[in-house]
Amino acid sequence: MKKAFYMMAAAAIALSSCSSEETTDVAKSSTITFRTTVGLNSRGAELTSDNLQEMWVSAFYQSNGQSYFDDQKFTKETGTGTSTFIPESPQYWQEGRTYKFVAISPEKTTWPVAPTITKDQVTCADLAPATTITDQKDLIIGAVDATSANHNTNGVDLTLNHILSQIKIQVKSDNEHIVYRIKGIRIVNVAKNKGTLTYSTTDNKANWDLNAGQKVTYSYTFPQPIVLDGKTDGVKEAVLTGADGGAMIIPQGFTPWDGQKVTDQAPYNEGTYISLLLNVKAVKGTGYMYPAGAQGENSYGWVAVAVPNNKWEIGNKYIYTLDMSTGCGKVDPVDPEENPDTPIVKPGVDGNPGKGENIFGDVIKFNVTVTPWATPNVGEIDMSTGTIKVNNSPAKKK
């Protein structure tokens, strides 16, 4: 009896897909199933074993590398209580055949560069993530060999691997005396904006060639400013790289910004750093702490913090938490003004901190000494006479 091809994940997500192809012995074929997981180390919107809804699979005959089916879409079935994925058209095992299944998500037409999929590898030439952080995508690939004899009951175990590095940036503050308004974020001077990917379906290992890459800045301007006020009933922490994850960046090594003040003798070292578009105000007081020329809560300037490591590895998620309880970083070493035509940060002018300098100095404090009271000896008053005793002797009456 013919059985439709479908995919099922017992513990996580099913992640394969198929298009209809001829079979040599459909009378004895059984259902093809998959039990798949997404690698734990993982954007924009990261893909996990829990949230994956769609996947696309290509299948090849292991014997000659010819295609059995290409780019079949599977969608997670609803209302079943299981992670079962239903294909757009059924597919069947062929007795005696061994297949190479290659799965990707999202669909190849939505990748920055559409991948080329063969039995032995997946390749993408000059793949460059979008420069707007929330437009970036988490890209995953997985491959496995399977036969009906070994997998017609329990399904095929298939693991999908993240091929990018994820950079998640979040902030926190428990200082209820300062209000921070954050309008945007940048990851500045990332070393390589693109690379050529080669993913081996034999060992599920990815390699990146970054020779053609150039420096790039990734950014995101928020629809509404994020306000941190440090109060128990207010907002004390927030994610800046999108609610569903972080920036998705080509894995690479890089030189971090050295965090030093920029001068003619010590110029900016061209390193990578994180920058926030920020407005800072003390709760008590009428002036703004940053930018120096702020005219209200809608005046912003860029502040910076150095990235604390020098490498982002494939499949790793890096979470940077910026604690702003006692400070907000340094003046951006390159472009501190939101609008250079109407500068309000004015680094190094009228006593303002220069590029690369701390925005907050040390906490203002005082070493207090109270002058002791002077206590001249005025004698004692004799209440019987209303006179003052001098040297403990009764005063003479006038």
What name fits each language-model region?
Residues 2-398:
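Sec-type signal peptide cleavage vicinity
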